[in-house]
């Protein structure tokens, strides 16, 4: 009988993720994220620990009445050095796509990586969520979080509902094999999924969160879905080359990527619609990565470089498993 090594490794990784999520959601598994440091200015004080406890019973943890000043949906957009695209995004969303939305029913925040390190899309989305959890600690679990790209939006209103319910992830735009582009998820479900991996290179974070959502039993609904090539979704051209980390591919294929709870020493301050993220530590050191340029015209599939699964990596670049 022939066996596929790739299939065996994939099944093993899925089982590891399943066990990890099970253990992390046990009664006493979570440690408080006591390194989350919101900053209003350069001398900001440390706030109390940010709890990472995930409610097991959704109805019991959802407030019956939500104040009028709490939005029903929050857009989180990973961001750095895209000022013109940001202006166009806000103009089009407010004047066209969301023009009929009641005032105060939604908020848009740009999770701004405010440092010189490689851009970490997963961490920006994770920290954007954590910042909103801090802002709405009693109600974040029932808010619909919409993860969106700054260079992408519907051409007209009423194409996308930007709403979902508990247990359902609404994927509106992207590819079927990953939760990228535009999707909506309830705060409690995002927290249960453990969020995105904090990869330092392009790609794969969307693959991981799709796997995590499925592992905990969430349904991915694509009944209102637009493929990446659909011209009804406006998407700015941003070149063909992407910076990838060879280490990310190895972690995705052979190990367990880090997650929402791996982020430490987070420092941020909010200015208008910016969440300015000045520092964070994750499960892997960006200075210990090996980066390369990838031309997306050659496809989106990232392969494990030959010999990389046998390399010796610095201990602080590997996420320490909890099982």
Regions found by a protein language model. Name each.
Residues 82-97:
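Short, well-formed alpha-helical segments that are part of the catalytic scaffolds
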Residues 120-122, 144-148, 152-248, 252-253:
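Conserved catalytic core of nucleotide-sugar-dependent glycosyltransferases
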Residues 72-74, 208:
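Cell-envelope/extracellular polymer assembly enzymes that use nucleotide-activated donors
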Residues 74-82:
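A conserved hydrophobic helix/loop-capping motif in glycosyltransferases and polysaccharide synthases
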Residues 2-12, 20, 207-323:
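C-terminal catalytic/acceptor-binding lobe
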Residues 103-141:
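Active-site-proximal specificity loops/subdomain of glycosyltransferases
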Residues 76, 107-114, 144-151:
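Extended hydrophobic secondary-structure segments that form protein cores and membrane-embedded regions
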Residues 18, 25-30, 34, 40-45, ...:
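Asparagine/serine/threonine-enriched low-complexity, disordered tracts
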């Amino acid at each position: 009988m022939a066996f596929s090594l790739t299939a065996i490794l994939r099944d093993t990784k899925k089982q590891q993720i399943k066990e990890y999520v099970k253990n992390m959601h046990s009664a006493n598994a979570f440690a408080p994220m006591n390194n989350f440091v919101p900053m209003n200015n350069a001398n900001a004080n440390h706030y109390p620990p940010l709890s990472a406890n995930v409610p097991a019973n959704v109805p019991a943890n959802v407030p019956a009445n939500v104040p009028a000043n709490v939005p029903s949906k929050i857009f989180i957009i990973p961001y750095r050095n895209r000022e013109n695209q940001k202006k166009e995004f806000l103009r089009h969303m407010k004047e066209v796509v969301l023009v009929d939305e009641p005032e105060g029913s939604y908020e848009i925040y740009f999770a701004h990586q405010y440092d010189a390190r490689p851009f970490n899309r997963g961490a920006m989305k994770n920290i954007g969520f954590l910042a909103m959890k801090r802002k709405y600690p009693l109600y974040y679990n029932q808010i619909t979080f919409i993860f969106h790209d700054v260079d992408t939006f519907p051409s007209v209103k009423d194409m996308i509902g930007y709403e979902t319910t508990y247990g359902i992830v609404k994927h509106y735009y992207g590819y079927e094999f990953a939760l990228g582009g535009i999707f909506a998820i309830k705060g409690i479900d995002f927290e249960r999924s453990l969020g995105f991996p904090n990869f330092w290179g392009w790609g794969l974070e969307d693959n991981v969160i799709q796997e995590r959502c499925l592992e905990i039993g969430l349904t991915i609904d694509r009944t209102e879905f637009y493929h990446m090539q659909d011209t009804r979704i406006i998407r700015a051209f941003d070149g063909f080359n992407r910076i990838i980390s060879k280490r990310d591919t190895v972690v995705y294929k052979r190990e367990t990527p880090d997650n929402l709870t791996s982020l430490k020493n987070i420092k941020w301050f909010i200015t208008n619609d910016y969440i300015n993220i000045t520092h964070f530590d994750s499960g892997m050191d960006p200075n210990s990565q090996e980066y390369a340029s990838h031309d997306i015209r050659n496809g989106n599939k990232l392969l494990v470089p030959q010999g990389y699964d046998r390399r010796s990596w610095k201990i602080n670049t590997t996420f320490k498993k909890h099982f």
